[in-house]
UniProtKB/Swiss-Prot annotation:
Primary gene name: hrcQb
Self-association state and partner proteins as the record states: Homotetramer. The four monomers assemble into two tightly bound homodimers. Interacts with HrcQa.
Name the UniProt record assigns to this protein: Type III secretion protein HrcQb
Top-level division of the source organism's lineage: Bacteria
Organism: Pseudomonas syringae pv. tomato (strain ATCC BAA-871 / DC3000)
Signal sequence range: none
Compartments, as annotated in UniProt: Cytoplasm
UniProt family annotation: Belongs to the FliN/MopA/SpaO family.
Positions with biased composition (Basic and acidic residues): 23-33
Keyword Cytoplasm: yes
Keywords, sorted A to Z: Cytoplasm, Virulence
Keyword Cytoplasm appears in the UniProt entry: yes
Length: 137
């Protein structure tokens, strides 16, 4: 038998195997896709209650990093001025700020929003009462 004949036999056997294997895999994928989830499937898992969720969060947070100080910024809106408008600013000038409702501000770490809240008076000082936390990545 020549080398060419051996090669042709190998190619034919591979083609037969590939066709059968591909067909079986396709049937298996189709069955899995449309199968009903059973009680033990990942879809049937119950959501953890609040106590379990708090414990998981405490376990995930490294305690050594808890004392790390972060610089946060309180943003109460945005405005855009030309250089000429900036030069004309004087005491008593009122600037219209956009991007946030009056009395509200956004708490940020760098460019990442951490929380939103309402500006409040805390013993004569400005404070932020959190009304909504940003989703964690």
């Amino acid at each position: 038998m020549s080398t060419e004949d051996l090669y042709q036999d190998d190619v034919e056997s591979l083609e037969d195997y590939d066709d059968e294997t591909a067909e079986q895999e396709h049937e298996h994928e189709h069955e899995q896709q449309w199968a009903e989830p059973d009680d033990e499937s990942e879809y049937a898992e119950a959501e953890p209650d609040d106590d379990e969720q708090e414990e998981q969060e405490e376990q995930q947070a490294p305690s050594g990093l808890d004392s790390l100080a972060l610089d946060l910024t309180l943003r109460c809106g945005e405005l855009r001025l030309t250089l000429a408008e900036l030069r004309r600013l004087d005491a008593g000038t009122i600037l219209e700020v956009g991007g946030v409702a009056p009395g509200y501000a956004t708490l940020c770490h760098g460019e990442r929003v951490v929380a939103e809240g309402e500006l409040v008076d805390v013993d004569g000082r400005l404070g932020l009462q959190i009304t909504r936390l940003a989703a964690q990545p």
